[in-house]
């Protein structure tokens, strides 16, 4: 937890940005796994953490902008809880730790909101991603649980996005720590990548590192020989010689700040010539982004530029043809890279995605696209100093997508389908690093680059 002055300052800024009314920020509850007493690993809501800092479940933070009052609502534990879980500070003590003057039992929250509504104060809350919180909100505010998104405050969303999108010095230190944990995870994955070891075994090793150094992984690890599956979870299948292992994994540090990196490792210890060709194509796009990303440059242009670099290299491999600009404008490259270049990162690995990507990554001028591939771009706006972005181009050979496009004759003027068939069982390559946008350019969030050059990846894989 940061010093209470940081949370106080954040709430004061939020008041100024919202202007009037009552802001209600819901913390998360425990979520049962297979029966009520066996819960999933607890994860606090990120916006609640940002403004109220407390990790305990069952809390709601309230900021009355008009009357300049702040409350923490929640229930104190009883002796039965103490027997099983030990002593937990009272809600009043938790409030004081983050500079909040008032606390009250959860049962009083509804009456508090009723009084605010009777006084015609606007009520500001965020869209919710958990059904139990949606039900809680419906009980308090009086609308159907499925209507919470429609009633969410755009004013509050935009205010929080503006604050959380630009990372402050204390946050950058936490992100650096998360990145350094991620370095250890990916090097361990490379060292353990060999024929006969299961995907699940390696995932267990790297997730153990994340748990031992922080709060665990920042998302379920993607670790698979089938890198063409964008979110392929680890299986119990043993790694096979000749294939590539794609590992997309990250960590949360003790303050819940995230990291997210992707590397690809040859199971045999050496890349084949075919694998090198695709790997270098992706790396060229990745490196171009690192060279060009700076304040004022649109992330949309970074994405399209990376796609042009990838297309040029695929033309050299005879997988694509024709004019590069025309091919990218038509979306032909999306058969190979059907996703966006990257995303914001912070307290969420896809930072603030639950608030709506139209607010986080777009504006009135730059809107989300409907074109296949480009429609998965999570950000298009100009970069600003303090943004933390992932740089993660990729190239994939997805058999079902190849068959669909080939059968439709789609983009046949740009794609050499006969040559693509030679890569049908290739899998996929994605290379991802976390970048901090600085005053004049960008730098890695962490202290050191995870091995990425082909010779370095092979060295770690073969020799440890």
Give the location of each predicted region:
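Active-site neighborhoods and metal-handling regions in enzymes and metal-associated proteins
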Residues: 1-464
């Amino acid at each position: 937890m940061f010093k209470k002055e940081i949370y106080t300052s954040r709430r004061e800024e939020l008041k100024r940005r919202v202007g009037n009314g009552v802001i209600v920020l819901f913390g998360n509850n425990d979520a049962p796994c297979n029966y009520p007493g066996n819960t999933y690993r607890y994860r606090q809501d990120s916006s609640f953490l940002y403004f109220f800092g407390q990790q305990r479940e069952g809390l709601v933070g309230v900021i009355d902008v008009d009357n300049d009052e702040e409350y923490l609502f929640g229930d104190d534990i009883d002796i039965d809880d103490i027997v099983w879980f030990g002593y937990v500070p009272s809600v009043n003590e938790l409030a004081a730790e983050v500079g909040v003057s008032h606390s009250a039992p959860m049962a009083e929250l509804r009456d508090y909101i009723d009084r605010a509504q009777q006084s015609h104060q606007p009520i500001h809350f965020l869209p919710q991603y958990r059904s139990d919180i949606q039900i809680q909100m419906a009980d308090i505010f009086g609308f159907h649980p499925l209507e919470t998104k429609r009633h969410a405050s755009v004013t509050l969303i935009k205010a929080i996005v503006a604050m959380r999108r630009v990372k402050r010095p204390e946050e950058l230190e936490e992100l650096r720590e998360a990145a350094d944990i991620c370095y250890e995870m990916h090097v361990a994955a490379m060292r353990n990548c060999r024929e006969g070891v299961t995907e699940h075994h390696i995932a267990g090793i790297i997730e153990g590192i994340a748990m031992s150094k922080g709060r665990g992984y920042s998302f379920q690890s993607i670790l698979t020989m089938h890198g063409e599956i964008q979110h392929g979870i680890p299986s119990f299948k043993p790694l096979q010689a000749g294939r590539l292992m794609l590992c997309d994994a990250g960590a949360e540090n003790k303050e819940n700040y995230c990291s997210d990196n992707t590397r690809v490792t040859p199971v045999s210890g050496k890349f084949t010539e075919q694998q090198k060709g695709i790997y270098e194509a992706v790396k060229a796009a990745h490196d171009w982004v690192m060279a060009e990303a700076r304040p004022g440059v649109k992330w949309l242009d970074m994405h399209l530029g990376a796609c042009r670099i990838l297309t040029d290299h695929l033309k050299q491999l005879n997988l694509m043809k024709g004019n590069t600009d025309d091919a990218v404008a038509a979306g032909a490259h999306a058969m190979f890279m059907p996703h966006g270049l990257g995303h914001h990162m912070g307290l969420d690995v896809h930072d603030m995605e639950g608030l709506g990507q139209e607010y986080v990554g777009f504006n009135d001028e730059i809107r989300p696209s409907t074109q296949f591939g480009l429609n998965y771009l999570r950000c298009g706006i100009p970069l600003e100093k303090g943004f933390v972005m992932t740089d993660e181009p990729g190239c994939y050979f997805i058999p079902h997508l190849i068959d669909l496009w080939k059968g439709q004759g789609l983009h046949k003027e740009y794609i050499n389908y006969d040559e693509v068939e030679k890569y049908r069982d290739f899998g996929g390559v994605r290379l991802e690093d976390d970048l901090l946008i600085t005053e004049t350019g960008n730098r890695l969030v962490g202290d050191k680059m995870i091995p990425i050059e082909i010779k370095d990846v092979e060295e770690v894989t073969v020799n440890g």
